[in-house]
């Protein structure tokens, strides 16, 4: 069984969320469970051309949450959250 990861969220990611409401609650709940489901990956991946690091992107309540797994230290780093526009 995969080991759970500790989740770290860049504070700037929280600033784009609504101050209250269901959408905010859904994203915060995703942060809470991400450590135990990170091994499943996101909805899609992006590769940073400079670092060659793979980032996972998950759609949650109208937001794109970008994160990566730092395997050696069992941590997940949430590095970006932005609203999805059509």
Where are these regions (language model features)?
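Short, charged/polar low-complexity linear motifs in solvent-exposed/disordered segments
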Residues: 33-35, 84-85
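Arg/Lys-rich, positively charged N-terminal/basic patches that mediate binding to nucleic acids
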Residues: 1-32
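N-terminal hydrophobic or amphipathic segments with adjacent small-residue motifs
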Residues: 35-36, 56
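Basic/aromatic recognition patch in beta-strand/loop cores that engages polyanionic ligands
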Residues: 43-86
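A short, aromatic/hydrophobic, helix- or strand-capping loop or linear motif
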Residues: 28, 32, 39-47
């Amino acid at each position: 069984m995969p080991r759970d990861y500790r989740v770290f969220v860049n504070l700037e990611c929280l600033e784009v969320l609504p101050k209250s409401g269901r959408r905010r609650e859904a994203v915060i709940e995703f942060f809470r469970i991400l450590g135990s489901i990170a091994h499943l990956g996101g909805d899609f991946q992006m590769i940073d051309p400079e670092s060659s690091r793979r980032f996972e992107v998950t759609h949650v309540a109208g937001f794109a949450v970008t994160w990566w797994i730092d395997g050696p230290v069992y941590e997940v780093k949430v590095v970006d959250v932005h609203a999805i526009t059509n």
